[in-house]
Amino acid sequence: MAMSKIVSLTGLLASASLVAGHGYVSGVVIDGQYYGGYLVDKYAYSDNAPDTIGWTTSATDLGFVDGTGYQSPDIICHKDGAPGALTAEVAAGGKIELQWTEWPESHHGPVLNYLAPCGGECSAVDKTTLEFFKIEAKGLIDGTTPPGQWATDDLISNNNSYTVTIPTSIQEGNYVLRHEIIGLHSAGQKDGAQNYPQCINIKVTGGGDATPAGTAGEALYKDTDAGILFDIYSDLSGGYPIPGPEVFSA
């Protein structure tokens, strides 16, 4: 079979895997303490769901937001995202381990992390007023052989978890942490990229005086961005341009 046909078949199989279960952030660990997240496949159907630090969402299918939703509020903290009632405290410079329920191996792509100051209690914030600055991102790790090794592969190998460090220089206060996977397994075609944004409320303590400029959630991406419209089954020797704003550095 010709290589082009093999690559096409690989892409087709990856698209078919959409029926496979995606995951979500079920909880986080901060300084040894576990905080439960919003269990969308359970709490969305309950009249007595507990308060959590995780934002609620209507994405009970564990689905995604694609390029057609990049200018809608759904891209901010997933479909119909609404603030969690609780907030977890973390020291500036501290680490947050985000635990996913699962992640499909075929759904290769980057992992990105943003913060947005709430300007008050995050439980009452209007998500459309949030302005996000990127604090960390990982994309293509090894592109020797398509579809390559990606940040999602490392997440899977780390027991479906990802750890992000809060910058030491930012002002203390209440923030929304926007943690996101972008699945690129179908991104060779327009609106094929799949965004899975997950949001939690945190309070940063002991920080510095930095107030990084941010970007509204609906302005983070365009469906034609080089890191959004990207074929992972082609030659990857040129690397991968991580989409969105540049990572904040103090």
Curated annotation (Swiss-Prot):
Necessary cofactors: Cu(2+)
Task: List its EC numbers.
Answer: 1.14.99.-
Disulfide bridges in this chain: 77-199, 118-122
* Use in biotechnology or industry: The activity for cleavage of beta-O-4 in lignin and hyperthermostability could be very useful to design an efficient, yet greener and sustainable process for producing aromatic compounds through lignin depolymerisation.
Compartments where located: Secreted
Entry's Gene Ontology cellular component terms: extracellular region
Q: What EC class does the entry list? A: oxidoreductase
Q: How does activity depend on temperature?
A: Optimum temperature is 100 degrees Celsius.
Protein origin, superkingdom: Eukaryota
What are the GO MF terms of this UniProt record? Answer: metal ion binding; monooxygenase activity
Keywords of this entry: Copper, Disulfide bond, Glycoprotein, Lignin degradation, Metal-binding, Monooxygenase, Oxidoreductase, Secreted, Signal
Task: Tell me where the signal peptide lies.
Answer: 1-21
Amino acids binding O2: 185, 194
GO BP annotations, alphabetical order:
lignin catabolic process
Chief location category:
secreted
Glycosylated at which positions? 159
Q: How does activity depend on pH?
A: Optimum pH is 7.0.
**InterPro entries given in the database record:** AA9, AA9_LPMO
Which Gene3D superfamilies does the UniProt entry name for this protein?
A: 2.70.50.70
User: Which residues does Cu(2+) bind?
Assistant: 22, 107, 196
Cofactor: binding comment: Binds 1 copper ion per subunit.
The task this protein performs is described as: Lytic polysaccharide monooxygenase (LPMO) that exhibits oxidative cleavage beta-O-4 linkage of lignin resulting in the formation of aromatic compound guaiacol. Catalysis by LPMOs requires the reduction of the active-site copper from Cu(II) to Cu(I) by a reducing agent and H(2)O(2) or O(2) as a cosubstrate. Does not use cellulose, cello-oligosaccharides, xyloglucan, xylan, chitin nor starch as substrates. Able to depolymerize the lignin dimer guaicyl glycerol beta-guaicyl ether (GGE).
Please state which protein family the record places this protein in.
Answer: Belongs to the polysaccharide monooxygenase AA9 family.
Name listed for the protein in its UniProt record: AA9 family lytic polysaccharide monooxygenase AA17
* Protein species of origin: Aspergillus oryzae (strain ATCC 42149 / RIB 40)
